[in-house]
């Protein structure tokens, strides 16, 4: 076959967007949770211990004890449509598809762990004949545990392909002006609905301190996100704080811890708090069960009177707008025309090699 023939080249002109998040069990049962945790906790990006040390602990202790407890937690937040994380993620993909209608972009969802998998999502894009791939991890703050692990999974799948697409993958958007604006909007709406609280807590998923000491920028990016949002709202330093949740194991993690912060505030006389979790692109076990149920109960039991959880951005119009902007920016040069009007401010931005221009634009917006 002539390699210049259309049959050999394939389509190769359309853009495929892979939306990806952490993942979820298929059911709130010990068996399903065990299967999910086995895949999740076997990732060397997640637990950076020597395999000969960690795997016996994982299979001999963790997978024997934790699934039953975790399944009960999942059952508390499981919806009629299934896992909240999967439901919100599917809605995000559907809304983004609608937002990009007519631009020759195919959006698929693939979870890092569980189903639908990154592999199945990439195979769907290959079957559709896309020649350009934009991987969009829904982790605003970069960490090797999350974003880099997505890169690993994509690379493993593509490693078995003979014909590779062009690939781009942003490494986060923790200080993206649109993201900061959307988080700020969500907080303002909560303040209008429930009143201005005594304290606002920015709660991010925790990370072992050892990972930060090895160079992971996650902690600094969490602080930067919270500071940008607080500054945009004009909050005084004594009215807000950053804390880290979901700590497990005996190791030191990024501090202060969310639960300890909330209970200490209540005991010190803080009566009302609102908690926002900007690192979670969709509500999930860590926000709905850990924060909105268990941490709420702990705060009230310690003497607090009013606790409000501010939902994740989920598939809100503001969030879909962020995702659209990210696709337009990182797909620059791939699309015949970026979504929206050609001269629309903020649509054209970061393509490969345009990081400096983006940073200058961001400084100007500040």
Predicted feature descriptions by range:
Residues 1-366:
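Active-site-proximal alpha-helix that buttresses catalytic centers in soluble enzyme cores
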């Amino acid at each position: 076959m002539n390699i210049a023939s259309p049959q050999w080249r394939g389509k190769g002109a359309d853009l495929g967007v892979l939306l990806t998040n952490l993942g979820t069990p298929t059911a709130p049962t010990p068996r399903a949770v065990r299967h999910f945790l086995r895949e999740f906790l076997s990732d060397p990006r997640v637990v950076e211990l020597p395999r000969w040390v960690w795997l016996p602990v994982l299979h001999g202790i963790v997978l024997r004890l934790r699934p039953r407890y975790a399944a009960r937690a999942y059952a508390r937040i499981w919806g009629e449509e299934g896992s909240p994380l999967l439901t919100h993620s599917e809605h995000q993909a559907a809304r983004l598809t609608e937002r990009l209608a007519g631009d020759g972009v195919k959006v698929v969802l693939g979870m890092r762990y569980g189903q639908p998998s990154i592999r199945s999502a990439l195979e769907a894009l290959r079957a559709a004949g896309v020649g350009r791939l934009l991987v969009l991890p829904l982790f605003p703050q970069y960490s090797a545990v999350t974003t880099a692990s997505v890169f690993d999974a994509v690379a493993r799948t593509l490693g078995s392909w003979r014909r590779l697409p062009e690939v781009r993958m942003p490494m986060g958007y923790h200080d993206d002006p649109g993201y900061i604006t959307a988080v700020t909007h969500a907080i303002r709406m909560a303040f209008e609905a429930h009143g201005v609280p005594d304290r606002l807590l920015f709660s991010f998923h925790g990370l072992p301190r050892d990972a930060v000491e090895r160079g992971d920028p996650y902690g600094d990016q969490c602080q930067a996100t919270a500071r940008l949002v607080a500054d945009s709202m004009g909050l005084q330093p004594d009215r807000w704080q950053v804390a880290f949740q979901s700590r497990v194991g005996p190791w030191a993690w990024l501090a202060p811890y969310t639960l300890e912060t909330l209970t200490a505030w209540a005991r010190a006389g803080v009566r009302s708090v609102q908690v926002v979790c900007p690192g979670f692109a969709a509500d999930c076990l860590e926000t709905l069960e850990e924060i909105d149920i268990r941490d709420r109960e702990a705060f009230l039991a310690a003497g607090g009177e009013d606790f409000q959880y501010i939902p994740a951005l989920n598939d809100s119009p503001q969030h879909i707008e962020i995702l659209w902007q990210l696709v337009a920016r990182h797909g620059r040069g791939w699309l015949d025309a970026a979504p929206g009007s050609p001269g629309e401010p903020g649509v054209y931005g970061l393509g490969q090699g345009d990081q400096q221009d983006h940073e200058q634009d961001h400084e100007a917006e500040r």
